């Protein structure tokens, strides 16, 4: 197998990263592709009480176990199968369940801090930042957290104003400068997605 191509897709919460990723995956049908979500790598918090876990700031870079993510990517690139962790949001700690990933032609790493860590960026062949208006991002986050995570609207808005927005401005927005391409308006930008697909295909064939 040729060298594994690693793609990083970053952007704020609700920016449309998942939509962009889904369309790139669809365009790459016929290739062997794996999607690894950075959210899988929230740190294990078994050593903390449940009350302490409730205070976790999931929008801070320190919440992620990037060392494990980097090691998993290196192993996959070297042809090894890896066990990727998963996260239990109800208990605010790592789940006992893992997901088995085998080496692929392309690995997509998607997450709000996908471009924040320099050692992680160094593994990437293509770095993408999805840039979407803040008003649209908060609306998407409200819908997601209420429907998928059982949150109330009040709690989501409070978290956005006190944590998500400040963390975005401090840590996520600045990573835009590391991107090879910035995709405005997420998955609706078919031109940018097609350009990125063509670039990825060219890397696979090298």
From Swiss-Prot:
GO MF assignments: ATP binding; cytidine kinase activity; uridine kinase activity
UniProt source species: Macrococcus caseolyticus (strain JCSC5402)
Localization terms from the record: Cytoplasm
Pfam families hit by this protein: PRK
The protein, known as: Uridine kinase
PANTHER family per UniProt: URIDINE KINASE
The enzyme's E.C. designation: 2.7.1.48
One annotated Gene Ontology cellular component of this protein: cytoplasm
Reactions the enzyme catalyzes: uridine + ATP = UMP + ADP + H(+); cytidine + ATP = CMP + ADP + H(+)
InterPro entries: P-loop_NTPase, PRK/URK, Uridine_kinase, Uridine_kinase-like
Binding site for ATP: 11-18
């Amino acid at each position: 197998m040729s060298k594994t191509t690693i793609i990083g897709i970053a952007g704020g919460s609700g920016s449309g990263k998942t939509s962009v990723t889904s369309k790139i995956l669809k365009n790459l049908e016929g290739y062997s592709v794996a999607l690894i979500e950075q959210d899988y790598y929230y740190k294990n918090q078994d050593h903390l009480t449940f009350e302490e876990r409730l205070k976790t700031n999931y929008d801070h870079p320190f919440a992620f176990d990037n060392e494990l993510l980097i090691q998993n990517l290196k192993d996959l690139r070297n042809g090894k199968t890896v066990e990727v962790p998963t996260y239990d949001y109800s208990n605010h700690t790592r789940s006992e369940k893992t997901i088995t990933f085998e080496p692929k032609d392309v690995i997509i790493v998607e997450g709000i801090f996908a471009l924040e860590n320099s050692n992680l960026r160094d593994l990437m062949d293509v770095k993408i930042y999805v840039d979407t208006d803040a008003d649209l991002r908060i609306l998407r986050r409200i819908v997601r957290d209420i429907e998928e995570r059982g949150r109330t609207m009040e709690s989501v808005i409070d978290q956005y104003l006190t944590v998500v927005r400040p963390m975005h401005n401090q840590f996520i927005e600045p990573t835009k400068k590391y991107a090879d391409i910035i995709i405005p308006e997420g998955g609706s930008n078919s031109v940018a997605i097609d350009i990125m697909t063509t670039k990825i295909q060219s890397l696979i064939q090298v």
